[in-house]
Each structure stands twice: as structure tokens, then as C-alpha cells.
Design a protein with these regions (language model features):
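Helix-to-loop junction immediately C-terminal to a conserved catalytic motif
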Residues: 52
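ABC ATPase NBD coupling module
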Residues: 15-18, 69-85, 114, 186-188
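Conserved ABC transporter NBD signature motif
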Residues: 60-68
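Conserved ABC ATPase signature
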Residues: 137-141, 145-147
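Catalytic Walker B motif of ABC-type/P-loop ATPase nucleotide-binding domains
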Residues: 162-165
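Short coil-to-helix segment of the ABC ATPase nucleotide-binding domain corresponding to the Q-loop/switch region
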Residues: 97-105
Length: 223
């Protein structure tokens, strides 16, 4: 499903070249739950951005769903992204829309029939345990509820791949456990999950395959 072949990424900051990833090769199979860990600045977010084609590698090849993202035509990028759910540390909910409207938004943009939207939104809210908060606004949600709403939005199109970038970074321990439980449920439903976190203990708690980045290099592949 995902393959990186000797991938490097270098950013230019004025005249200075800053390496973010260096010679990373890995494979993630369909149906895996993989934890990507490492300190802040290790390259986790850069790697995820390459996977949903928000950026391109400086060297090497990135393949997702069998497509080489470096040669993917512009018109095919949107189709790729529709097959990938993405969640960030900040829930990024639209403040003037209800939970239901936030989750439904992308389906409306795609012209999905109203009846199908209703079914898909409530299916997603049920998975994340937020059905009773469908008409609440973001300001009325706890941080954990807001992140669950963000997860519902990410899975409402039933993507085969979910990328989660530090989704528990702003949460307390109880809320963190809630989100990890939701991620397990999403994975159990057949979605491939890649979770990036700087919190190494989460990888141990999840007992899943763990990829460790250090200064842009893949230094461990365990589990």
C-alpha cells in the first residue's frame, strides 16, 4: 500500500539547506496499524506530507496505492487525497458549523446525495462515539470531543488509509486514551492507520509496529 524507496527531503531556508528526511526506505501493508515516532523535528510530519502528496521528495520515490506520487498527474492528486483521511494535532473544525455540518462538509462539496450524506455522517459519528453531539458547535466541545469530530470528518468518505499527525498532542491522559481507542476501532474496521507521535510511550501502549525516526533517518522498525 505504501512504499518509500531511499527518500530524502531537503528544505531551503535562504542559502541554508536543511535535511528533513535522509535515505528513508520502508513498506506499510494494507491493514496495518503503524506508529511513527521520534522527537519533534525528527521528520514525522514531513513523511506524512509526502504520503498525501502535500509535498514531493528531493530524492527517491514515494508510492501510495501503487502510484508513484512523483509522476502523478495534477488531475489525479485530488482523487488520491479523497482516498486518504488526515487528522492533525489541532482539530481544525469550522467554528460556525455544527459537528454534523463539519463532518458533512466535504461530502457536500463533492456533490454527494443528501440521504447518503446523512447516513455516512452518522455512521462516522457512531464510530467515534459522538452521535449525541451532532448538533453541538466546536466551542461547546471538550478537546477530546473536538478531536473525535475531526476523526469522524477524516473517515466519513471511508478512506482505506488514515494519517494521524500528533492527534493526542493537546490532550490530557483520559482524552488521549479515548482517541487511541477510536483509532483502534477505525483500524479494526479495515482502515490502514499511520499514527505519528513524539510520545514514545504511546507506541508501547498500542503494541503495534513502530517506526522510529531520528534526525530524518529511520533508525528502528519494530513489531
Amino acid at each position: 500500500m505504501i512504499e518509500l524507496h531511499r527518500v530524502s527531503k531537503v528544505y531551503s531556508v535562504g542559502p541554508v539547506k536543511v535535511p528533513a528526511l535522509s535515505d528513508v526506505s520502508l513498506r506499510i501493508n494494507k491493514g496495518e496499524f503503524v506508529v511513527l515516532t521520534g522527537a519533534s523535528g525528527a521528520g514525522k510530519t514531513t513523511l506524512l506530507r509526502l504520503l498525501y502528496r502535500d509535498d514531493l521528495p528531493s530524492d527517491g520515490n514515494v508510492e501510495v496505492f501503487g502510484h508513484d506520487l512523483g509522476t502523478l498527474k495534477h488531475r489525479d492528486v485530488a482523487a488520491l487525497r479523497r482516498s486518504i483521511g488526515v487528522v492533525f494535532q489541532d482539530a481544525k473544525l469550522l467554528p460556525v458549523r455544527t459537528v454534523y455540518e463539519n463532518v458533512a462538509f466535504v461530502l457536500r462539496v463533492l456533490g454527494t446525495p443528501k440521504r447518503e450524506i446523512t447516513q455516512r455522517v452518522f455512521d462516522a459519528l457512531r464510530v467515534v462515539g459522538l452521535s449525541s453531539r451532532a448538533q453541538a458547535y466546536p466551542a461547546q466541545l471538550s478537546q477530546g470531543e473536538a478531536q473525535r469530530a475531526s476523526l469522524a470528518r477524516a473517515i466519513v468518505r471511508k478512506p482505506p488509509l488514515l494519517l494521524a499527525d500528533e492527534p493526542t498532542g493537546n490532550l490530557d491522559e483520559a482524552m488521549e486514551d479515548e482517541i487511541l481507542g477510536v483509532l483502534r476501532d477505525i483500524w479494526a474496521g479495515g482502515t490502514t492507520v499511520v499514527l505519528a507521535t513524539h510520545q514514545a510511550y504511546l507506541a508501547r501502549a498500542l503494541r503495534r509496529r513502530t517506526l522510529t525516526l531520528q534526525s530524518g533517518r529511520l533508525v528502528k522498525d519494530e513489531g
